[in-house]
Amino acid sequence: MKKLVIALGGNALQEAGKPATAQAQLEVVEKTSEYIADIVERGYEVIVAHGNGPQVGRIVIQNEVASASTPAMPFDVCGAMSQGMIGYHIQQGLSKVLRHRGINKNVVTIVTQVVVDKDDPKFKAPSKPIGPFYTEEEAKAIAEEKGYTMKEDAGRGWRRVVASPLPVEIV
């Protein structure tokens, strides 16, 4: 069986201009799953990889807001939470579409871990946009208040950026 890797960006998992709810993300994933199912029908074993910028950023914000009531999780745990959520939605959406087409295939999620070099220079130059978009004024206020690095993101607004070191190994 031929294998095909499909990469979905985190921004591709949400519809521009719509609320970033779990239900809205699931609806986008279900639409995307129609295309993935077409590929499965052509005889491919499909591996779906995905980004998580908007999702992990929102999870971090949720943790910050709730931190007065419950301890906030560290960033790596928030990343794993976003992987689990996105994988869960892909499992739900793709399984539903495959089932409706009479295709009996298992869909599984794997939460990955990577090893990075603690001396990677990218730790000193944050570049991965996460979370929602802000106006320039909002971004400056957030940077001042929280000490975050904020950058303009492709003409769409300003976002927090975090370090994105190169993986040395996948665990």
Region locations from a protein language model:
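Generic detector of intrinsically disordered, low-complexity, polar/charged segments
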Residues: 6-7, 48-50, 144, 152-154
